Structure formats: structure tokens, C-alpha cells
A protein has these predicted regions:
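A short hydrophobic beta-strand segment most commonly corresponding to one strand
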Residues: 60, 87, 101-121
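A short, N-terminal "cap"/entry segment at the start of jelly-roll beta-barrel domains
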Residues: 1-36, 117-131
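Conserved short histidine dyad/triad with adjacent acidic residue
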Residues: 24-27, 38-55
Length: 131
């Protein structure tokens, strides 16, 4: 068993390769092999969002603060609110983030396949982000 203190977790700013705007990440679960589960607390400032991406085994989001958006390729963004849980099936192209006027924090839970939890695609355009 391993207990990780909250004081030992490092908050880091998310990479601009995969995010637009200011996004902060805290690793919650980085279970060693053979376990596959990974979880992050991700905080998006207003207007911030992920790039388009997929997850090999799907992803669950749980909204812990604020109001956000989630969008599946070729669809309009949908609102996510505090307390909502969203399941994204394996390999579904999507993005998620805050609205233009509200911050949003979610817990992102996904499993790794061959060490990979996501495949990152292109950045989300302002047109795709409009709701």
C-alpha cells in the first residue's frame, strides 16, 4: 500500500500542445503496472479547453466545480455542471473545458492501454468552441 499526502502532490500547468488557455493538473492516481487506472484533477480557467483527443479505453469525467463544455466530433458543445458525470466511449473524438465566463474543475478517470491514456489530435478552433 502507498499513501500519497496532498502536500506531496505537485500541481502543474498543462501543456499548450494539448490545451488552449490556462489549465492546471493534479495527479490523483498513477497506479503502477499492471494496474491501468489514472485519474487527474483538472482545473480550467474561463475559455480554457483541451485539444481534440480520444482515449483507448474511454474516459469518465466528474464535474466538481463550475460550468464546462464537452463536445463530440461533428456535434455542438453541451453544458456540464457541478455534480454531472460524463462517460466518453473508447476512441470517441471529443474535447472538454470551461465556458467563456466560468471556470470548471473535473476529475478525469481513464485507463492506460500499452502505457497510453490518450491520443492527442488538433487544437479546437474558436468555431468548434462556440456554443
Amino acid at each position: 500500500m502507498k499513501i500519497t499526502s496532498a502536500n506531496d502532490r505537485k500541481t502543474k500547468q498543462a501543456s499548450s500542445n494539448w490545451f488552449t488557455g490556462t489549465v492546471w493538473q493534479d495527479s490523483i492516481i498513477e497506479a503502477p503496472d499492471p494496474a491501468r487506472v489514472r485519474a487527474l484533477r483538472v482545473s480550467f480557467e474561463p475559455g480554457a479547453r483541451t485539444a481534440w483527443h480520444t482515449h483507448p479505453l474511454g474516459q469518465t469525467l466528474y464535474i466538481v466545480h463550475g460550468t464546462g463544455l464537452i463536445c463530440v466530433r461533428n456535434n455542438k458543445p453541451q453544458l456540464m455542471r457541478m455534480g454531472d458525470t460524463i462517460w466518453i466511449p473508447p476512441l470517441e473524438e471529443h474535447w472538454h473545458g470551461a465556458t467563456t465566463t466560468n471556470s470548471m474543475t473535473h476529475i478525469a478517470i481513464q485507463e492506460a492501454q500499452n502505457g497510453q491514456v490518450a491520443e492527442w489530435l488538433e487544437q479546437v478552433t474558436d468555431e468548434d468552441y462556440s456554443y
